[in-house]
Amino acid sequence: MTVKAPNFKLISTSNEVVELNKIKSKLIVLYFYPKDDTPGCTLETKDFNSLISKFSKNNCSVYGISKDSLESHKKFKKKYKIKFDLLSDEKKIAIKAYKVWGKKQFMGKEFMGLIISSFLIKNKKIIKEWRSVRVKNHAQEVLNYILDK
């Protein structure tokens, strides 16, 4: 089952406005993460970064999205030599459209936050989604799904 991927326009670490519906790649991976430079989010981003050439060989663009500022994203990208764009969603436009903002629990306390999730998009449709992701090996899991298709 596929569903139309919500379009959005967000500013990238390349200082360009990225509009989902105008991305030329055959496949697009959007991975949503809570915060730059935190242990789990850094692990996930570094894993996608280490596999970026394999995603590219399969005509797949990868974008990381969080509500961090563009300045925060740029520092994060530079620190870890990330080879793809991060998108700043401070107003939670894509975050809400993809329904990745919700109740979370940490150390017995409930709060609202970004739920780590990824989406694979083809022809403006979501063809696969991963919600409440465990970050270890997730990038490889996404790549394996693409290679198996």
Show the residue positions of the predicted features.
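Chalcogenol-based redox active-site neighborhoods
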Residues: M1-K149
